[in-house]
Amino acid sequence: MACGLALKRPLQHEYESFLTDETYNGEAKRARTQCPPFRAQMGTIAATLPSTSTFAQKFKEQEESVFQAATLMTRLSRNQLKTYLSSEVKNLRKRKAIPRSNDFDDDGDQRGDGCSSNYSKAYRAPSSPKSGSDSEGEAPSTSVTDRSSAKREFTMANVQMICERLLKQQEIRLRNEFEMVLTKKLDEQHQQYVQFAAEQLNSKCVSTGDDYSYSYLS
């Protein structure tokens, strides 16, 4: 009710008479009668402010090593490493550097029926007339035993895990070497700068005749 009555008042006449009064400064009155600037809601302000996780992430990015950018660009993913190892295995098999095995397919994954397929290929039942004796049927069983004993010790997953660990160790070693070399170079440059500053100060002392023996470089 009060708000509605206040809006219905004829404020234009009162406002003009108030401004035409000579006892007061009109500019000051106009400045006082102006509405305050619009203030945004507190929820909008809070939404626009960055969260604590954003600050923590920025602070973490500043503290990261110089290797971070190079690591993201050059580090091999698991799929890339698996593809590389599979291609290397294929090349070695083509050059007959490693024997072919049916336990693993071309992608390097282990087959579930590898043992049964090897056994079915190696064992030949004495059904033909040429293999009437039992000794001929027992002979291929020894080859199955030899193949099972000569089974590879590492699968593709084991080789991939070993390569990942070796790459990680190599990365740590390179980082340590780089930090040592960088620290040594910075120390040498600092010593050269201190020596240069001392020589300049001594030459200035000799030319001007002033005594700077108690300077901050002493």
UniProtKB/Swiss-Prot annotation:
Keyword Protein biosynthesis in annotation: no
Give the similarity note.
Belongs to the akirin family.
Q: Its GO CC terms?
A: chromatin; nucleus
Q: Is Transcription there in the keyword field?
A: yes
Q: Where are the transmembrane segments?
A: none
Q: Where is this region: Disordered?
A: 96-150
Summed up, the tissue specificity of this protein is: Localizes to somatic tissues throughout the body, including muscle cells. Expressed in lateral epithelial seam cells, the hyp7 epidermal syncytium, and multiple head and tail neurons.
Complex and partners: Interacts with hda-1, a component of the NuRD complex. Interacts with let-418, a component of the NuRD and MEC complexes. Interacts with the transcription factor ceh-18. Interacts with ima-2.
PANTHER family recorded: AKIRIN-RELATED
Gene Ontology MF term list: DNA binding; transcription coregulator activity
Cell compartment(s), UniProt: Nucleus
Question: Chief subcellular site?
Answer: nucleus
Q: Any idea which UniProt keywords this protein has?
A: DNA-binding, Immunity, Innate immunity, Meiosis, Nucleus, Transcription, Transcription regulation
A GO BP term, please?
meiotic sister chromatid cohesion
What does the UniProt record say this protein does? Molecular adapter that acts as a bridge between a variety of multiprotein complexes, and which is involved in antifungal innate immunity, development of the muscle and sister chromatid cohesion. Plays a role in antifungal innate immunity by acting as a bridge between components of the NuRD (Nucleosome Remodeling and Deacetylase) and MEC chromatin remodeling complexes. NuRD and MEC complexes bind to the promoters of antimicrobial peptide genes and may recruit other proteins such as ceh-18 to control gene expression in response to fungal infection.
Q: How does inactivating the gene affect the organism?
A: 16% embryonic lethality, reduced egg laying and a 0.9% increase in the number of male progeny. Delayed progression of meiosis, which most likely results from defective disassembly of synaptonemal complex proteins, and defective chromosome structure, alignment and condensation. RNAi-mediated knockdown results in reduced expression of the nlp-29 antimicrobial peptide following fungal infection by D.coniospora. Worms show reduced body size and muscle function.
The protein's name in its UniProt record: Akirin
Where along the chain is composition biased (Polar residues)? 128-147
